[in-house]
Amino acid sequence: MTFQSLILGPALPEILLAVLGLVLLMVGVFRKTDSTGLVGLLAVYGLLMALAVVGLGAAPETPQLAFGGLFIDDGFARYAKALTLLGAVLTLLLSMVWLKRENEGRFEFPILVLFATIGMMMMISANDLIALYMGLELQSLALYVIAAYQRDNLKSTEAGLKYFVLGALASGLLLYGMSLVYGFAGTTRFDGLAQVAAAEGGISTGLLIGIVFIIAGLAFKVSAVPFHMWAPDVYEGAPTPVTAFFAVAPKIAALTLFARVMMGPFAAYADQWQQVIILISILSMLLGGFAAIVQTNIKRLMAYSSIGHVGYALIGIAAGTTEGVRGVLVYLAIYLFMNVGTFTVILAMRQKGRAVEGINDLAGLSKQHPMMAAAMAVFMFSMAGVPPLAGFFGKFYVFMAAVNSGLFALAVIGVLSSVVAAFYYLRIIKLMYFDEATEPLDALSGTTMKVILIGTAAVVALFFLAPSVVVDGAQAAAEALTFASAR
């Protein structure tokens, strides 16, 4: 490995965050007074600085490599990192409100979020199976800890333990798949794997089995069926801001990694893996739709809703085209704002100063807090795919990608599962506007939560006025991915 191959410029945002994380650890340890607020504020500034580096700099015309080719910087990575960093900033701001309100402040929390975000960014820019695994595990180790952040809360401890045990199993599947791929292809580099595929013209059974194991490991990380079993319990048991973080940033990073792996090194084998992705997508959409209907806890409902949304996003990957990748990226951008806004409302659900999570606790919300009810209605209508809200456009682009790729049955199943899912979204709206409250919710307090709620609701409601802001960026990012894959 030459000095030239160790150029670090493409990894500048990750390096900045890593240095900041180490500095904040020392600040937290050596500062005598409680440093949670200071460390949290500096972590937010650091994430915003990384977002500025990612978003303001022009994406390279050709992919830039670092660390001997293990790390890649291209337009696709820039777009996905911008979404991941934005999700991390918004959920960390919500977390700081919760930490102060619940008197749960410990300086390690924002640092763990910081390191989890670094892992996600490494995943997005992975250009090698080993780099992919390192990023994935850095993210996972931090997430295991924050899932069990409330050490004295039985549900939180259970959530962390379940996520850890099942996550270790998924990591084992992923590693086994990587070992098979390396054994049969002779390389772990993405460009090397693509060259092997082009040279052989076919696929060996061992390599195919390895790809299936890799898909299984990645499916766990995005909570796709049948590897979803951890999501409902972890979403319900983890602290609400942690659940919000789980539902947004790691999901975006893992789905974009999924797209890079399938459309990069394994693009030539699309005929083989496409059927697996289609099956996972259908199962996720159907389970996410039907299982959520019977839920009474809103965080558990959001877990199944998230599983359904993963199914819709996987439609774009199953399409196996630039248009499909664009659909996934548009969907994830919209999903980010819908979910952050919804979890802001969930975090605000309190009765006499006590947090509540029952869906029925939203009854009569429109009479008590009309602004909060209106914002929640916007998010629910959008998740149901009602035009002209943003959620409609997200589903439209992935369904169109499926149709243009000849996957008519998959698109039809997606539309039908959207109709099923609309039932539980509209049920929440019915509760807020047509039912009477047994006990009123406390008023929404705090400027941070109000700004996030109004901002996310405005983006979701007014997206149709300027969809090109997101769609054009997604198109350029998708073209960058397919260009890199074709090299």
Curated annotation (Swiss-Prot):
Membrane disposition: Multi-pass membrane protein
GO terms of biological process kind: ATP synthesis coupled electron transport
Which UniProt keywords are listed? Cell inner membrane, Cell membrane, Membrane, NAD, Quinone, Translocase, Transmembrane, Transmembrane helix, Transport, Ubiquinone
KW Transport (keyword) present: yes
Please state the protein's primary subcellular location.
membrane
| Ranges that cross the membrane | 7-27, 38-58, 79-99, 111-131, 164-184, 207-227, 238-258, 276-296, 301-321, 328-348, 373-393, 406-426, 451-471
InterPro entries given in the database record: NADH-Q_OxRdtase_suN/2 (IPR010096), ND/Mrp_TM (IPR001750)
Entry's localization field: Cell inner membrane
Q: Name one GO molecular function term.
A: quinone binding
Query: Any idea of its EC number?
Result: 7.1.1.-
Pfam hit, one: Proton_antipo_M
Does the record bear Cell membrane in its keywords? yes
Subunit-level organization: NDH-1 is composed of 14 different subunits. Subunits NuoA, H, J, K, L, M, N constitute the membrane sector of the complex.
What's its job?
Answer: NDH-1 shuttles electrons from NADH, via FMN and iron-sulfur (Fe-S) centers, to quinones in the respiratory chain. The immediate electron acceptor for the enzyme in this species is believed to be ubiquinone. Couples the redox reaction to proton translocation (for every two electrons transferred, four hydrogen ions are translocated across the cytoplasmic membrane), and thus conserves the redox energy in a proton gradient.
Family indicated by similarity: Belongs to the complex I subunit 2 family.
Q: What is this protein called?
A: NADH-quinone oxidoreductase subunit N
Record organism: Rhodospirillum rubrum (strain ATCC 11170 / ATH 1.1.1 / DSM 467 / LMG 4362 / NCIMB 8255 / S1)
